[in-house]
Regions:
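Alpha-helical transmembrane segments of multi-pass inner-membrane proteins
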Residues: 29-32, 116-162, 170-239, 261
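Hydrophobic transmembrane alpha-helices of multi-pass, membrane-embedded glycosylation machinery
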Residues: 48-57, 123-124, 224-236, 252, ...
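A membrane-periplasm/extracellular boundary helix in multi-pass inner-membrane enzymes
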Residues: 217, 238-282, 297-304
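Hydrophobic transmembrane alpha-helices and their immediate junctions
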Residues: 245-247, 350-386
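Transmembrane alpha-helices of multi-pass inner-membrane enzymes
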Residues: 383-393, 397-429
Length: 429
């Protein structure tokens, strides 16, 4: 007799099925705790990873059709290639001897440990046979509540800081803004097929206003621009361009009111960017944007010199030599013990072209899996890949332990939500 794996356990132990049913809520809670209570979020992350590792061998024995099994193997291999290459790079190149570079080496080691720990968390929803699922309305309500609650927590912190840009928990303001965008976009994504009632439209408008103000509170220019762009695209995709004049009038009034409430913060960040650009054009790179431009220049030089990868220590020596030769602005050395503020340049400057290829395989794995699977996960995969690609242009997300844990739990959340929304019958909340 063939062993049915976790499917047999689901029949004999209904409580286990209920636990799996609650997995999306636990993952959503973990994502929220990473932002608000990082220590609790890390604890929950490792608990979920341990439970997934415990039940993953049972789930692997279930009967699957050929196509789902092939797709599962595709995504599994993409995850393994990304994690395996980073581990091989850490093993091959020696650790830095300069104490000032220890934080960089530790960040890479911790990041790889997090993704390795998260591997069972990502694989279990792929192979899990459990059929008990949350209702689509329940999942939507949970994500909308999380988005609204995080927005209010951010606005409360902003009020207490007297209008100064704020982060959440131990996360810096920029990272907090990126993770808030992920939660906010996922909440709006779940509204796509529903036909809302009039009072629900009002609630959705209030939710969007809260989301926008929470991004403004972080003072992150990239997150603000991306949020407005994605929101505009989502509205056009959902409703089309041709609407009544009342719809445009209400949208214009809401936009003007939101801009008026947030103009002090938005205007200050715009003026700061203009000042930084003027200073950089005059040769002063000791500003927020000036340091970023210098770091990007340093990353380009590193890729040209060592396209196949190098150690952290070797890259630092190269940067000092370039500054000494006058080929690089000395502002690039200010953050030598952090990162290059660009995901691709950070990967290429250390892990070379093979490292960039492994990261591309990771993203393409989600893309191909989502495209072939279709339904909800196709939209989620597009959004998930865009999160890493777009925000990775202005920061290095993989080296932040909170963002790495969030990214792993968020991907697992999408894998759990996919069958919920693919199998739904209802069209109204």
């Amino acid at each position: 007799m063939r062993f049915d794996g976790a499917a047999g356990l689901a029949q004999k132990m209904p409580m286990l099925g209920r636990v799996v049913q609650a997995a999306p809520l636990a993952l959503l809670l973990g994502c929220c705790l990473i932002l608000t209570l990082p220590a609790s979020g890390r604890t929950l992350f490792y608990i979920l990873c341990s439970l997934s590792l415990l039940f993953l061998p049972l789930a692997m024995f279930q009967r699957l059709e050929a196509k789902p099994k092939a797709l599962n193997l595709l995504l599994s291999f993409a995850l393994l290639i990304f994690i395996g290459f980073r581990a091989a790079w850490l093993w091959y190149f020696p650790a830095p001897t300069d104490a000032g570079l220890f934080p960089v080496a530790f960040a890479y080691q911790l990041s790889n440990k997090i993704w390795l720990s998260a591997l069972p968390l990502l694989l279990f929803p792929l192979w899990s046979p459990f059929r008990e699922r949350l209702s689509p309305a329940g999942a939507t309500l949970a994500l909308v509540s999380a988005s609204a609650l995080l927005s209010m927590i951010t606005l409360k912190a902003w009020y207490d800081a007297h209008g100064v840009r704020v982060g959440l928990g131990s996360l810096y303001a920029t990272g907090a803004a990126y993770l808030l965008c992920a939660i906010h976009f996922s909440a709006l994504l779940l509204f796509h097929p529903f036909r809302l009632k009039k009072w629900q439209w009002l609630g959705l408008c209030l939710l969007i206003a809260l989301q926008f103000m929470s991004i403004v509170a972080t003072g992150t220019r990239a997150a603000l621009l991306v949020y407005l762009f994605v929101l505009g695209c989502a509205l056009l995709w959902r409703f089309g361009l041709y609407q009544s004049w009342r719809t445009y009038a209400i949208a214009a009034l809401l936009s003007v009111a939101t801009l008026w409430l947030s103009w002090a913060a938005v205007g200050s960040r715009v003026k700061e960017a203009q000042t930084d650009l003027i200073a950089y054009s005059q040769g002063n790179a000791d500003t927020s944007l000036g340091i970023r431009f210098s770091l990007w220049d340093a990353g380009v030089h590193a890729v040209r010199e060592q396209p196949w990868g190098q150690s952290i220590q070797a890259r630092d020596v190269l940067f000092h030599q370039l500054v000494k030769d006058g080929a690089l602005n000395k502002a690039a050395l200010i953050m030598r013990d952090v990162h290059l503020h660009n995901e691709w340049l950070e990967i290429l400057s250390l892990q070379g072209l093979p490292g960039a290829l492994s990261w591309l395989i990771f993203l393409l794995g989600f893309g191909v899996y989502g495209w072939k699977r279709g339904g909800f996960f196709r939209r989620f995969a597009l959004f998930y890949i865009g999160f890493w690609l777009v925000f990775g242009l202005s920061d290095v997300l993989l080296l932040s332990p909170q963002i790495a844990m969030f990214g792993a739990m968020f991907a697992a959340l999408g894998l759990y939500l996919a069958p919920i929304f693919d199998a739904r019958d209802e069209r109204t909340l």
